[in-house]
């Protein structure tokens, strides 16, 4: 019984930690919008609760709004920002379901060997960590290429 309680506690902590991970989120004040109305989507770069840095339009590889089989690409003028948060200022059309998607251009970061190995452990990539161990690469620094993709 004690093992189950400890396991449940660890699982809960890992789920909470994943919510507060550094990532990209789209947030609106409401998911129920009137037709032909203006609304703002906050582009949160950090956690779901707090944005740590505004994404610039130049950093985006794609911004799409899809509804009724049509895809629209908002322009740079539709994006505003303050120090920590970017805002997509959009207008709905006819009543229906809308999907907003956003992708950033890929970036590359250099990581020291120990930091990269820890990252692989934390992100649940044991196969990659084991491959580094088998090939004798545990002491080699690494580069990670990443991009962020989000939809709402």
What is the meaning of each model-derived region?
Residues 22-152:
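N-terminal soluble domains immediately following signal/targeting peptides that reside
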Residues 8-18:
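Bacterial N-terminal signal peptides
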Residues 1-9:
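Bacterial N-terminal signal peptides that target proteins for export
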């Amino acid at each position: 019984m004690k093992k189950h309680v400890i396991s449940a506690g660890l699982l809960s902590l890992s789920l909470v930690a994943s919510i507060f991970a550094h990532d990209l989120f789209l947030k609106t004040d409401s998911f129920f919008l009137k037709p032909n109305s203006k609304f703002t989507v906050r582009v949160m770069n950090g956690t779901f609760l707090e944005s740590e840095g505004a994404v610039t339009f130049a950093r985006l590889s794609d911004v799409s709004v899809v509804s009724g089989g049509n895809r629209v690409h908002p322009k740079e003028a539709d994006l505003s920002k303050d120090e920590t948060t970017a805002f997509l200022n959009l207008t709905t059309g006819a009543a229906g379901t809308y999907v907003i998607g956003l992708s950033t251009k890929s970036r590359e970061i250099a990581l020291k060997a120990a930091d990269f190995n820890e990252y692989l452990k934390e992100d649940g990539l044991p196969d990659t960590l084991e491959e580094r161990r088998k090939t004798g690469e545990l002491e080699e620094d690494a580069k990670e290429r990443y991009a962020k993709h989000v939809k709402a």
